[in-house]
Every structure is written in C-alpha cells, then in structure tokens.
C-alpha cells in the first residue's frame, strides 16, 4: 500500500521501455511477471559508508537476504525523484539528498526460490543522508553501514546471501565509481 492507503500500481513496459499500462503491484509479481518500471537506490552517509539492508523475513520475494539500501516502483505519473524520496521515508525513515542516477539503463530478471519472478527496468541511483535509518519492520530486518569495497567483496565471495539485483549492480563500473 502507498502512503495514502490506496493500492500501489506499477508501470508496465514494452521491450523498448515504453509504458504500456499499469497493474496492481500485489498482482504483478508472479511466475510470469511482466517487465515493469522500478528503481534501486544506494545511500551513503557523510563518512562514505553505504547502507545495506536485510530484507524482512515476511517479504514475498527474497526474504532475509541482504540488498542495497532500498528499492521501489514509481507510480503512474510519479517522477523517480518523488518515488525515491517517498520510499526512503516509508521504508527507512530517511531524508535523502544529492540523488544521482548512476546506471540509467539497468535491467534484470531473476526468479526466487518460490518461483516468483522479478522482471524490472530499474535505473540505479545513489543518494546521501545525514541520519541513521528508522526501518519499517515490514520491509527491513536489519541494516548496516559498510565500506563500499567491503560490500563488493562480500557480494563477490558469497553471492547467495545477497539479492540478485545487488549482485548484478555491484558489477557495474559506474556504480563502483559512484560508491567510491
């Protein structure tokens, strides 16, 4: 559900990433998930450490795995900037600044252990915050601030402990450069 308690909708896309319609988020993630619009955000603190989160055990897909700071879906007619600020507040209680897209054409498809598919065109952003998270229990089981090089090393040595999209993202040179 979104902040105003209306069911969340996602933007469906064709193979050229053009909108073709919308669908309820609660109904779109299945064994045959259509391509849809999303985003991933990596949040840095003033010390240059990156926030990683462990997905809540109640999450439908990839419960309990470590991932990037947060992800989400822009609603119909919602800008990435507004959607990212909304999800930062909802999921982590964070105010963010210096939002920058670092991998604008990121796309992935992955199937979790239950057979549910993620199929997203998902630009990757980096932002900065000055505060510690106040995570929503329904979204985040735990979190940690870590040096970017330590995150990359952990993902490379134990990829099964991390979300598949994070594994793909840390291989992107532009993200590595942005994280420092």
Swiss-Prot record:
Q: Tell me the cofactor note.
A: Binds 1 Mg(2+) ion per subunit. The magnesium ion binds only when substrate is bound.
Which pathway?
A: Isoprenoid biosynthesis; dimethylallyl diphosphate biosynthesis; dimethylallyl diphosphate from isopentenyl diphosphate: step 1/1
The record's listing under InterPro entries reads: Idi_bact, IsopentenylPP_isomerase_typ1, NUDIX_hydrolase-like_dom_sf, NUDIX_hydrolase_dom
Look up the EC number in the record and give it.
Answer: 5.3.3.2
Keywords, in A-Z order: Cytoplasm, Isomerase, Isoprene biosynthesis, Magnesium, Manganese, Metal-binding
Positions bound to Mn(2+):
29, 36, 73, 118, 120
Compartments it resides in: Cytoplasm
Q: Which reaction does it catalyse?
A: isopentenyl diphosphate = dimethylallyl diphosphate
Q: Name one Pfam family in it.
A: NUDIX
Top-level EC class as recorded in UniProt:
isomerase
Tell me which residues bind Mg(2+): 91
Membership in a protein family: Belongs to the IPP isomerase type 1 family.
Q: What does this protein do?
A: Catalyzes the 1,3-allylic rearrangement of the homoallylic substrate isopentenyl (IPP) to its highly electrophilic allylic isomer, dimethylallyl diphosphate (DMAPP).
Instruction: Specify the protein name.
Output: Isopentenyl-diphosphate Delta-isomerase
| Species | Kocuria rhizophila (strain ATCC 9341 / DSM 348 / NBRC 103217 / DC2201)
């Amino acid at each position: 559900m979104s902040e105003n308690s209306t069911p969340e909708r996602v933007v469906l896309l064709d193979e050229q990433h053009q909108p073709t319609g919308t669908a309820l988020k609660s109904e779109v993630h299945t064994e045959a998930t259509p391509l849809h619009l999303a985003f991933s955000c990596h949040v840095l603190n003033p010390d240059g450490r990156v926030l990683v989160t462990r997905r809540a055990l109640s999450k439908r897909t990839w419960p309990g795995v470590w991932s990037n700071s947060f992800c989400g879906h822009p609603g119909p007619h919602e800008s990435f900037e507004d959607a990212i600020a909304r999800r930062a507040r909802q999921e982590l209680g964070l105010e963010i600044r210096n939002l920058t897209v670092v991998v604008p054409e990121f796309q992935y498809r992955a199937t979790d252990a239950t057979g549910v598919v993620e199929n997203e065109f998902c630009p990757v952003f980096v932002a900065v915050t000055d505060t510690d998270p106040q995570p929503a229990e329904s979204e985040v089981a735990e979190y940690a601030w870590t040096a970017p090089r330590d995150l990359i090393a952990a993902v490379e040595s134990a990829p099964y402990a991390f979300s598949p999209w994070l594994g793909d993202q840390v291989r992107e040179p532009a993200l590595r450069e942005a994280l420092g």
